[in-house]
Amino acid sequence: MKNITNTSSLTNYTLVNDTIQLRLNFNTEIYIQNDVKLRLVKNIIERLNLTELKKVYSSFGRKPTVNPVTMLEIIIYCYSEGIFTSREIEKSCKYDLRIRYLLDGSKAPDHTTINRFRQKILELTPDILKQMVQILIEENQIDLTSIYIDGTKIEAYANRYSFVWRGSIEKWQEKLIEKIKKELGLSKNLTPDQVLQAVTTIFNQLRKYCKQKKIKFVYGKGKRKTKEQRDYELLKDWKEKLETYRKHLEIMGDYRNSYSKTDHDATFMRMKEDHMKNGQLKPAYNIQLASASGFIVGEKVSHHPSDMYTLKPFLKKLLENYQGKLEKIVADAGYESEENYVFLAENKLTSYIKPSNYEKSKTRKYKKEMEFRNNLTYDETKDQYISSDGKEFIRCKDRKRNHKSGYITTTKVYICFDWNKEGQKTKGIYIAETFQKYREESLKNIKSDQGIEERLNRSIQAEGAFSKIKSGLNYNRFHHIGKENIISEICLLSIALNLNKLTSKIENKNLEIIKYKAA
């Protein structure tokens, strides 16, 4: 036996190199035999159609370290355990026996291999989620008759102060265009693109002229620039600024009012987590999830901070994936709009959307106003309303509003010009007939016994999904940039949550379809 003395001045001890008898059991089955989730992830992956997944690696050249099916199993399992970064997944592949079992003797992939694989499956993850939901439907774990929808904002992986505002861009663009039109004598009716085209044409002509005349440009102190050089530099500056403004507006598109310079798909939104209490805007994505029977059945990633504009495109996607299976749509007050009501009616879906004035309708002031409205008598011949004391409300105009989605709503405006009550000379009432009709139907639905039960399930299932993501898995900020990456990330998270839910049901020996009952 050889003694090695440590000569460090900080410690004084002796290290002994001795022989240690190791007893290793290479049968990992012994250690993971009771892990339901591990066996479940393998069983589910085996039932998926992974033809496209197997094509992500080329059949030519070097063989991949780990085959794509095993890589998918590893990523889904790690996500279900709250492990998201490539380096943490790499560490799990090296030291976690459960992941070693999935690898089945293969070499542990490094973080670059894991990241490359995630990039290769960006377009495949939505279909994998859809296939998993179909398996759960076949196993009688999901009933799609009631869909519970909710949304949340998750911060993007972008710098918080990298904002570009539409208002600022449009303001400076307008000022510059006015200046250019005045200097160049252009028509006031020209659009920004036409002004840019005119400036570019003049700039190119001047550049060609300077080249032909061999005009020398000078820079620095004590140098006097020619008129041609000054005009050239001014036109170049105008051209570059106009192109920059146009690029900013193109990135934002028609519906957004901001974007981040470090993640062009992220929009600045007001978050619930406001530690400074100043309403600070942060770059984020609006994430929509649809739940049924405790499982996530669909996702939607939106630039728009309002939930109202996300419902219609989200439902189109769900109807395409699960044709003829959806019956009831349950959502909170943020989704209420005439456009959404009409879409639900056209697709024969029952609305359980909570009216945005539901809490306000319980106040004494609102009840008094509604009592006044209900006592009005409508005269069809004159198209006017008459109050109980004979006051006439004459239809003055129709107010049309064009929403960002392109949908146009019409509100009829009736005014009484001789009201002379409560300090008011006139009084107006505004009636949106289509919206009011659907709102009353939805209100009736949510107040019924069935509606109370559906609202209870929405609050538990839909909001519970985001609780599991943010609190359960501690996922409060994305780790990737770009909408395509975010969609893939949300799909993987949804698959992981579904895996956890099914594991919990199996361990608790409760495989009935989840439906919470009102007390």
Where are these regions (language model features)?
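Short, charged, low-complexity loops and linkers
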Residues: 23-32, 448-453
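Short secondary-structure transition/capping motifs
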Residues: 30, 62-67, 78-82, 103, ...
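Basic, short loop/linker segments at the boundary and entry of helix-turn-helix/winged-helix-like folds
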Residues: 32-76
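A ubiquitous short alpha-helical element
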Residues: 11, 57-62, 450-453
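Short helix-loop boundary/capping segments at the starts of domains
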Residues: 46-54, 77-84, 95-102
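Anion-binding and metal-coordination hotspots
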Residues: 15, 75, 82-95, 106-519
